[in-house]
């Protein structure tokens, strides 16, 4: 047992110094549990409350699309230059070295392909496996206005409930329903529904008109998808406008790994997201880095 005679009474209690409570300032996440906040603080840089994610989960329904034929050759060299990796568990286990030491957002929905109805997805990963992989969030598509809208919302609810049990954030990714136009009204509806169901992060698309209303009406952080490949200057302009209008980051794939200089593009995107560089200066950085 302890030698009680050798235990010295504490003296420096700082009685005149009130204890400070640290605030978790990420939008809408201040009341979450410690484990949930810890994972979110790995995804979002605590200094900026923003993030740059590299998405290479496309193969779960597209197969080996252009740029993703060989993850080890095309994507692995980009890992050091991004904040977060977004991929499936199959790619994570087979292609991402455990020593990479980057937070992972795990694609947790699937069971569909480009040959069938995309909205017909299921939860494709058990929460226990996500915990085993030590990821920082799970992600699933939500298809508002689609044939399988109800099913996709239930997928989000299932992940949120399981995530709350274990301290695992859920990112809802807004797919586009066939019967709705890709505009501010649609994405305001889709992002708000996903947030109301409890998702802690929303991934959606940038729109030229009214994006600030989408971001303002969503009570949790929004990150924008890169979408189809754009010329680098246009992609950087989209990033800048989204951040300027309230997005908390980007989750880009094709506009990174299909770029003529992927590392340079990632550095330029980082400058926009974390350093508030405008698109012109970021493009100049891209040009200088690609040489």
UniProtKB/Swiss-Prot annotation:
Q: Name one GO molecular function term.
A: acyltransferase activity, transferring groups other than amino-acyl groups
Question: What does the record give as the reaction this protein catalyses?
Answer: dihydroxyacetone phosphate + acetyl-CoA = 3-hydroxy-2,4-dioxopentyl phosphate + CoA
Q: GO CC terms on record? A: cytoplasm
**InterPro entries registered for this protein in UniProt:** Aldolase_TIM (IPR013785), DeoC/FbaB/LacD_aldolase (IPR002915), DeoC/FbaB_aldolase (IPR050456), FbaB-like (IPR041720), LsrF (IPR033673)
Q: Where is the active site?
A: 203
Q: Which domain of life is it from?
A: Bacteria
Cell membrane found in the keyword field:
no
Function in brief: Involved in the degradation of phospho-AI-2, thereby terminating induction of the lsr operon and closing the AI-2 signaling cycle. Catalyzes the transfer of an acetyl moiety from 3-hydroxy-5-phosphonooxypentane-2,4-dione to CoA to form glycerone phosphate and acetyl-CoA.
Cross-referenced HAMAP family: LsrF (MF_02052)
Q: What is this protein called?
A: 3-hydroxy-5-phosphonooxypentane-2,4-dione thiolase
Q: Which organism is it from?
A: Photorhabdus laumondii subsp. laumondii (strain DSM 15139 / CIP 105565 / TT01)
Q: Which gene encodes it?
A: lsrF
